[in-house]
Amino acid sequence: MVTHRQFPNHKVFEMEIGGRPFTVETGKVAELANAECICRYGDTVVLTTCTANPIPKAGIDYFPLTIEFEERMYSVGRIPGSFNRREGKPSERGILNSRIIDRPMRPLFDEELRNDTVVTCTVMANDYDNPVEIVASLGASIAIASSDVPWNGPVATTNVCHLNGRYIVNPSTEEREASDCFVCISSTFEKVVMIETEANEAPEAVVLESIRIAHETNMEIVKFINGIVAEIGKPKFTFEKAAVNHDLLDDLMNYGLNQIEYALDTDDKNVREERLTAARLDFQEKFGEKYEDFDTHIEVCLYKMQKKVVKKWLLQGKRVDGRGMDEIRPLAAEVGVLPRVHGSGLFTRGQTQVLSICTLNTLSAAQKLDTIYSEETKRYIHHYNFPAYSTGEARAARSTSRREIGHGALAEKALLPVIPSVEEFPYAIRVVSEVLSSNGSTSQGSICGSTLALMDAGVPIRRPVAGISCGLISDQETGEWRTFTDIQGVEDFHGEMDFKVAGTTEGITAIQMDLKNKGLTMEIIADALERCRKARLEILSEIMLPCIAEPRAEVSEFAPKMLSMKIPVDKIREVIGSGGKTIQKICADTGAKVDIDDDGSVFISAVDSAAAYAAKKMVDDICFVPEVGKIYCGKVVRILPIGAFVEIAPGHDGMVHISKLENRRVEKVEDVLNLGDMTYVKFMGFDEKGRANFSRKDALKEMENNK
């Protein structure tokens, strides 16, 4: 006997976002998870689940939250291109999407929660126009908020772009690519908790208005989510907060807070670490025997003591290294620091130092992407490496972290708006930023270093790009807050915000904002944007432009020489030849490499310019089509009793009839022309058989009249 399964808890909720329906289904699938939902926006569908371990994880001092963004190739009707035809590790964009979901949610969890929590977002259908990251972010917020996991959400996430003077909520892929400013904003009902921006040198006012519109949209979505939670939400479980020995903390505060102040009061990270180590040893000698659990709690106590000092100082307008609130650390910039590489730039800001190296190659070296997104290739690539030695740690190298991928992507999108088009500069471009020393804001250092390396490599970028970060400290009781420019490591660690802004003298190209508090008001955001604008202009004018004012006129002698041209589509077959014989001969004769696209774009690369231009001439000769009425200089290649054949380009000859040789009667062709002679002829057109006809007498007459 078969019984039909019922789903008594199945519910459907719907609202309109950006003029399109957004639908949420719950209570039908994944019933063993703490919470689940299926979100649909257009034809983009994402399944989101939330699971949590009821038992706290021992021996850790952080909240173990994991966001998994699962990309499924079936969502776009494709089979993976891997050997086993199965999805592997997440794509770079998938990792970036997981970070977009993680960053606004993490600050809203209790920092003393220790239960493993995993949110999994599986993309089940993707229509390309309704963004998967928005659907997944909203699904994650709904799943966590309706689960039994303690959380101070919900949050909502919205994209907004500025296109032709209009602000568009959750734009299509086409609208996003055509816009001059695109923002991805996460916020609670009250405040903004995450900002991600890519822009084409957008003014601060446009960015700020985009953020405001996104926040207003998010407020309506938060109301919608709260309605769902009110109907299906589970009671939150109670948890035991991470234990802190308050007696030890009180003793340390009374005895050693002045030692912590002394340790922090320096602009040298090494000196700071030495002083903190000395203070810890003193505390251990003083209280190690009194408290048996001293070793268990000392790190937490030291963290709280440092945070107390840093917060007090910043609210008073004092910084650990003695700088003013708008003062940038000492800067240095240098280009051409490595031999043989195509371009290099060393950028130093205080004890943060980044070496960026630029490599140029043929367009065939562009990164090919096999993902669920519409982008198929990536011509400009930026990679960011953060080795352990940059922070003085003794740790073996490991695989690329999500943080490294995120920082590399930030620098990549910061420079992308100023990268020349393929037509202007037909190269694939890769920049690698090696962090040599880290004391805060290495991602912004890599942006500055990348600009230097690109200019040193002769890449004709539209304008130099610089990056700077802004910090925040606030007092929740009094409402007092302060922002400060160019955060260093200890300010990043104990502060509440890392507001990273990149741009040119004309406007913003990228923003990434991370928070450790419950959100920002529009007033704080506006203040941070203005602070970063002033600092960015100072870095460009005082350090970077004096180092290298404009891109090199020529690419490095060690870089391949590239030329691009366009040929008629109907000529592609002739250039390639039967079985590729013609194009292979061009490559063999010149030593160049020739690539042809279906639209007739031709890209020629060679080790030297002479070889590249030789290959270009051979392609030009094959595609040559004479213009009726135009005069050409050609070589006599054959003589017949009725006329002479003149070749005006390799493989392109035609007949000059004996009657068209001179203005007088000619008895014999050899009386005027001989084999091998060079002569001017005028192209008169093709006959019914497609043969070219030339006239020498018309050419001479026209040339005489033009004297």
Question: Across the structure, where does each feature detected by a protein language model lie?
Answer:
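Long, basic N-terminal domains or extensions that often function
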Residues: V2-E240
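Extended amphipathic alpha-helical scaffolds
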Residues: V2-N53, D61, T238-S374, P560-E574, ...
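Glycine-rich, flexible beta-strand/loop modules in the N-terminal catalytic cores of phosphate-handling
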Residues: A33-V118, V123-A125, N130, E196, ...
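Conserved phosphate/anionic-ligand binding catalytic regions in large, soluble enzymes, centered on
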Residues: A35-C37, N130-V149, V335-C358, N439-V459, ...
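Flexible, glycine/charged-enriched surface loops at secondary-structure junctions
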Residues: E111-T117, N152-P154, I221-F239, N270-V271, ...
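Mobile "lid/hinge" segments at catalytic clefts and subdomain interfaces of large enzymes
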Residues: D148-L264, L454-A553
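Long, charged amphipathic helices and adjacent flexible linkers at domain junctions
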Residues: P235-H246, E538-M565, Y613-C633
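Single-stranded RNA-binding regions, centering on S1/OB-family and related RNA-binding modules
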Residues: F558-P560, V569-K707
